[in-house]
């Protein structure tokens, strides 16, 4: 019953508005999470991310706007979507803690920060959740922030647990990327890197076949197996995808499956960086 959105999803908080409308009369049934931090400006293809703003005043005004769009008086989990390179994380989290004190927010989260930043922020106000990319082809958090989350009692919330769609097996070449798809500019989805990464799918497909499941379901089952504090949030646009993801909960991977995954998907196995240099400078700060 966790719903995850952000003020930067769609133009002018459009996704938050959709969520707010959908939850009318049912708000109490869901844990509602949203985020702030990204700054967007008009571009040739709609509004585009141009920076990060973690100033206290901006965080307060962003929260007020999110509450209005979500049609609620409290946000269950409020994330700092990125750390502003010009504002100490402690200052941003301090402003967010004031929102908790005011009753507008129940708990705080961070998004793709380093272990050091996580610990500094947690010292200012308890951090309830850390959201970061994590999947079979992005296992680097196992060596950094995941141990810290276990130590501090922080939930680890993987986004893109299906490798931005790659682990579904639907994108094995550039022909699988439609015009306007943002992945067209992602390094891991370049023609050269896709050709190299496609070889990773064979062991995943073999294990999925053995379970009578789809590759995406087995990839999600692997993330779900990583610990009770790991709460993946796969993106879903279609009801069929939702049903498939729910079914992944019932897949029990064997020790042999896990060993095969470790051999086929060690940390750093994917060809290509996760982000372009322009976006990467805000990740893991």
Where are these regions (language model features)?
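N-terminal binding-site loop/beta-alpha segment at the start of enzyme catalytic domains
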Residues: 1-34
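Acidic (Asp/Glu)-rich catalytic clusters
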Residues: 20-31, 67-71, 100, 121-125
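Glycine-centered flexible beta-alpha turn that most often forms the glycine-rich phosphate-binding loop
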Residues: 3, 75, 108
């Amino acid at each position: 019953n966790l719903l995850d959105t952000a003020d930067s999803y769609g133009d002018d908080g459009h996704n938050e508005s959709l969520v707010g409308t959908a939850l009318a009369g049912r708000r109490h049934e869901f844990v509602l999470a949203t985020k702030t931090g990204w700054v967007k400006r008009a571009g040739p293809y709609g509004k585009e991310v141009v920076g990060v703003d973690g100033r206290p005043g901006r965080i307060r005004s962003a929260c007020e706007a999110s509450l209005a769009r979500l049609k609620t008086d409290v946000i269950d989990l409020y994330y700092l979507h990125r750390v502003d390179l010009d504002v100490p994380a402690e200052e941003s989290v301090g402003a967010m803690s004031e929102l908790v004190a005011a009753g507008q927010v129940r708990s705080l989260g961070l998004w793709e920060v380093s272990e050091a930043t996580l610990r500094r922020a947690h010292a200012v106000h308890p951090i309830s959740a850390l959201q970061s990319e994590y999947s079979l082809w992005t296992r680097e958090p196992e060596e950094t922030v995941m141990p810290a989350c276990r130590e501090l009692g922080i939930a680890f919330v993987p986004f893109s647990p299906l490798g931005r769609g790659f682990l579904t097996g639907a994108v094995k070449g550039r022909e699988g990327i439609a015009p306007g798809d943002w992945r067209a500019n992602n390094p891991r989805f370049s023609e050269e890197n896709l050709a190299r990464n496609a070889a990773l799918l064979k062991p995943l497909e073999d294990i999925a076949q053995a379970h009578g499941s789809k590759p995406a379901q087995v990839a999600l089952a692997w993330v779900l197996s990583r610990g009770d504090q790991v709460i993946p949030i796969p993106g879903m646009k279609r009801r069929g995808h939702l049903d498939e993801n729910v079914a992944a909960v019932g897949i029990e991977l064997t020790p042999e499956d896990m060993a095969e995954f470790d051999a086929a998907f060690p940390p750093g196995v994917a060809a290509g960086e996760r982000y372009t240099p322009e976006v990467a400078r805000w990740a893991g700060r």
